[in-house]
Amino acid sequence: MNQITIFCQDKYEAQKLAALIFVKESVETCITEILNVIENEIVLSLKDKSAHSVILKDNNQAVNFVDFIQSVVEKKHKITDTQIIDNVVKITKG
């Protein structure tokens, strides 16, 4: 699975998730670690060692995101694109 659709709590959380995990201008994957998952909230660590939380629609979305992003954290894949549509983020890895 190289693409996933993640439903966030709202549009702001979707924009935050897309901005935190991928920088389109430099085609750079920023996420380095998943620090914690608390129900539908995910706490991410970035390359600059900062930590940020993102609230997803429900617990299933959190589980799906963690499963999908694990290979990126392990550096087996990189994020290649993100698209935001309202409260939805489509993430592509390669």
Positions of PLM-derived features:
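Generic structural motif
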Residues: 9-11, 49, 59, 94
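Short linear proline/tyrosine/threonine-rich motifs used for host-factor recruitment
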Residues: 6, 42-44, 54, 89-93
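Short, compact, well-ordered microdomains
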Residues: 83-86
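Short amphipathic alpha-helix segments
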Residues: 16-26
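Acidic, low-complexity, intrinsically disordered interaction modules
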Residues: 24-81
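DNA replication sliding-clamp ring fold and its partner-interaction surfaces
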Residues: 14-17, 65
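Short, extreme N-terminal segment that most often corresponds to the first beta-strand
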Residues: 1-13
